[in-house]
Each structure stands twice: as structure tokens, then as C-alpha cells.
Amino acid sequence: ITLSDSVNPNTLTGVHAHKNRVYYWTGTSQNFYYSATVDTFQGNFTKFPVGLVGTFGGNILSINSLSIDGGEGVDDLLAIIMTSGEVLIYSGSNPSSDFALVGTFRIAEPVNEKRGIAKLGGDVIVMTREGYLPLSQVVRQDLIGNKAQAISEKIRGTVISQVKLTGTSTGWQIFVSPDVDKVYFNYPTGDTNDPFNQH
């Protein structure tokens, strides 16, 4: 892998394939890298900066595909989640030609662990300091001026308290069962991890 800005590829910590194109990021900057060709994990990758797109800063924590039905059929979008809680959503399949910014959205600051973000069907669930949010609801509710409701709303106080206690610790993780029948939200309690369950 060769990156266009000469950053050491060994510093890359994240990878995601969207519409057959591979994206890498380091987790310590506001840039991601994309391949000029599809269906390859190697070769030359071009830097794409997003630092001037948002307003709240932060580094790229995760990149995911998000499917949303906008009324004219389902559209597969690229969601870039920043450590600040800002979410940048793009349509298109090639950053060099047809990328278009759908919008920037604000959620509570995510727990600082990539495993606290997971794909669930066409949606993306994010563990934040105020609850566990489905990004599809964030986008839909923002468009009509409402605040998205967390799927953890019934245990909101417990979640907020736990994040205050161990929010900077490792062990935050969303695990979706193989049959997609259950979702487990693991959180660190000190020496071990305990789950909240969603059926």
C-alpha cells in the first residue's frame, strides 16, 4: 500500500469496503485514503481530507455503509463518524468524481472505541455517551427537525452513568448474534466486561 501523502501504511488502523472500493484511515487524523480502482486492497491510495467539512473537529473513528430509503428507493451512503460526534454522510461511489455531501449530523460523542460501532442490517449503531443510536434515525429525524431516540432510551440513566465510570476504558463493543436475533452491548466494568442485551 502506498499513500499519497507519504504517511506510513503501518499507522492505518481502519479499513472499510463501500461499493467495491476500499477506504483506509489512521484514527489519528481527519483524512481517509481511497483506491482509484475497485476490488483491491493494495496499490496507490489517495488522501481525502474532511477536516474542513465539519464544524466540531475530531478525528475519524469509523467509516461505515448506511442504507437509507429516501422515498425513491434505498440508497447506500458512506457514513464517516468523527470522535467529536459529528457524522459526515456522502453519496456516490468514487471520491474523485461523483462524491456528494448529503449532510453533516451531530450525535453525542461516541465511546472511544471502533468496536462500539456496528452494522445491523442496513443500519449503523453507535455507542455514545448518551445512549446507543441508530444512524438511520439520526438522519431521518434531523431532516424533520427532531432529535433521534436512542434504542437504549429505557436505560438511558444507566448507560450515561456507566460511560462516566469507564468511558475511556477498553472493552466497549457491540456484538450482533449470527442469526441477527440479539444485539449485545458490552461495556467495561473494571476487570471484566458486562452486556446490555437488545432483543
PLM region spans:
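Beta-sheet-dominated scaffold domains
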Residues: 17-20, 64-199
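Surface loop/turn motifs at the tips and blade-to-blade linkers of beta-strand repeat domains
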Residues: 3-8, 53-56, 104-110, 165
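Carboxylate/His-rich catalytic cores and anion/metal-binding grooves
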Residues: 17-47
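Extracytoplasmic beta-rich repeat domains
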Residues: 54-66
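Acidic/polar residues in short coil/turn loops that connect beta-strands
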Residues: 1, 26-28, 84, 130
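A short alpha->loop->secondary-structure connector
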Residues: 1-5, 41-45, 96-102
